[in-house]
Amino acid sequence: MYKIAAENLQALFQKIAADQDLYLPVKVSDQVNFKAWSEDAEVCLDTLKTVKSPKDAFFPQSENLYTCKKEEKNISIEPQALQEKNFVVFGMKACDIQGVKVLDNVFLSDPIDTFYAARRDHGTIVALACHEPEESCFCKVFGIDCADPVADVATWMIEGELYWKPLTEKGEALTKAVAELLNDADEAKVEEEKAAIRAIVEKLPYSNLSLEGWGQEDYMDRFNSPVWEELYKPCLACGTCTFVCPTCQCYDIKDYDTGHGVQRYRCWDSCMYSDFTMMAHGNNRNSQMQRFRQRFMHKLVYYPVNLSLIHISEPTRLLSIS
């Protein structure tokens, strides 16, 4: 276990960014999101949650896959280069890290998504425990411990000092790279901090919500429940919930005519859109109620049954936009 004074964090960021890209919570125009670090960036590690999740670091909102070029009768295809430079995502919360685990199940299963895999291979995650969870938090319901995040490095901000604990080979490598800035620390304060955070979580109003009834048994009763006809009505079909969600991974693949060829690119899509996965045989979900129901059934029933992992990890962010 190590620690570093808060006033020395700028030096820590400089040290990390000297060798690799560094992304962390940065405030821009009154909004905090994960962005590339710079000397004049307003870093906000005390922000409980960013507007968007940091999943962009591993699954970008838009990315080129390959480019087709035509010169007279000759056609060439240039694949997009995979991620080669190492990078660090600093300050991720336990719920967002759980979101990455969900993405891993999707993109690292056969057939492996090489673009995603390259970013995971080159990315190091530094987690930051939630010092004071909000009233709307209920990560405990999904088995997430916000007091003890599991990543390459786990950190806790306690009384003006950042406590630092490497947990993986990547974490050990990063720790070695910044060792001159770290001091040895006793784990006692961290254990006290964990206990204090968990005590807060236990008192939160939604911490004891139950997922009973959302399993495989009787799922058709849930599917056919008349309650969906009421629940979907406030939905604007804007898709914002899917874009800020750390676990949503739906995407579309499109072609863009550059004038000199065609770029094929991948971009996020949303199951809440009326034209989502428009198929030739016409088997689309025609109503917003059906799309709304599919989103929740996918996260709470279909995905857990198939992959033994709940497809929700950060409900508080979704509540803040509703």
Label every PLM stretch briefly.
Residues 211-262:
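Long, well-ordered mid-to-C-terminal structural blocks that present hydrophobic/aromatic surfaces
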Residues 207-212, 251-298:
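Non-heme iron-sulfur electron-transfer modules
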Residues 1-218, 248, 310-311:
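Iron-sulfur-associated redox domains of electron-transfer enzymes in respiratory
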Residues 310-322:
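Single conserved hydrophobic/aromatic residue that forms the stacking wall/gate
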Residues 84-86, 225-239, 261, 300-313:
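Immediate flanking context of iron-sulfur cluster ligation sites
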Residues 101, 145, 241-247, 251, ...:
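Secreted/processed peptides and extracellular or luminal domains of membrane proteins
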Residues 30-33, 133, 244, 252-255, ...:
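Flexible loop/turn segments at secondary-structure boundaries
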